[in-house]
Amino acid sequence: MRLYIIGNGFDIRHGLPTGYKHFKSYVAKNDQELYDSIEEYIPAGDEWNELESALGEIDYELILQNSEMFLASYNTDDWSDAYHHDYQYEVDKITRMLSARLKKQFADWVKGINIADADNSEQYIPPISRESLYFSFNYTNTLQQIYAVPDEQIIHIHGNCSYDDDLILGHSFRVEKSLNPYIGPDQDTRIAEAYDSIDEYFGNTFKPSEDIIEDIIKEERVFFSSLKNVDEVIVLGHSLAEVDGKYFAEINKSIQENARWIVALYRGEEKSGSLEDYDVRDSNISYVQYEDI
C-alpha cells in the first residue's frame, strides 16, 4: 500500500495562491488594522513566510508599551473611574486581533481559494492513485476536487476548509506560567489584568506544537493503525521542516519497517529538513524529480 504525504508545495505547484505571501496580500486588502498589527507585533518576515513559527514570538512587551498612553496616573487632576479599564481594553483589543481575529481571517482566506483554478496549472503532478492513503498538511480540497480522491482516504492533519471552522494555525506559543513578571499585591491591578489578557488569548489560540501533535496522534490513532500495510511513502510538496518532525516519526513507526520513502523535488530544490532526523533509515530514502515519480 502507498501513502502520500502532501505539503503546501503540492497546491502551489498546481498554481493555487496558498502561500503566506498570498495571505499577506489578502489581509492587506481586507483588514488593514490586522495587517498593521501583524507587521508591528509578529516577526513574520517580509512575505510572512515565517508567520506560523513567529506566532510563538509575538512581541507582547511592545503591545503593553504601546498601550501605556491609556494607563492614566491615579494622581492626575482629571482622574475618572472610567480610566480603570482603558489600558486593559487597548491591550485586550490587540490580543484579540492577533489571536481570534487573525484565525478568522485565515479561515476566510483559505475557504475563498478557488480549487477549480488548479485545472489551469501548467505543471501537473504525475497520476496519483485514488486507492492510496493521504496524509495532508493542507487545508484545501485539491485532492478531492482535482484527483477525485475519496474523503475517507485522506486525513487533513491541520483541518479541512470545507468541514472545520477551527483550522490549526500556529505551533509555538507556549505559556507555562504567566508572562507577568511582577505578580503581587503591590502591582497595579490594571497591569495585572492586561497580562492576564495576553496569557489567556495567546495561550488558548496558539497551542505549542508538541501539544498539538500529541493530541492529533491520539485522536487519529485509527488512521495511524491503518498504516501497518504501507510499504511505500511519497512526499509531495513538503519541506521536511523540523516543526512537523513528530508526524514523520510517528508515520515511520506505523508503516512497514523496510518501507520505501520517495521525496519529490523541484529542479534545484533543497529541503530544510531530513527524513533521517525522524528515524527513517537512509537506505530507505530516495530523492527524485517530480516528473520521475
Regions inferred by a protein language model and the residue ranges of each:
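An N-terminal structural lobe/cap that precedes and organizes the functional/catalytic core
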Residues: M1-D36
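SIR2/sirtuin-family catalytic core signature
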Residues: R2-H14, E219-I293
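Conserved beta-strand -> loop -> alpha-helix junction used to position metal-binding or nucleic-acid-contacting
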Residues: I6, S25-Y26, G159-N160, E291-D292
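Short secondary-structure boundary/capping segments
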Residues: P17-K24, P150-E152, E250-I251
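Hydrophobic packing residues within well-ordered alpha-helices of enzyme cores
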Residues: F23, L51, L143, I251, ...
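Short, conserved aromatic-histidine micro-motifs
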Residues: S25-I42, W261-E269
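Extended, H/D-rich, highly charged conserved domains that either
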Residues: D36-Y201
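A Trp-anchored, charged/polar loop motif used as the substrate-binding/catalytic surface
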Residues: N114-Q123, P208-S225
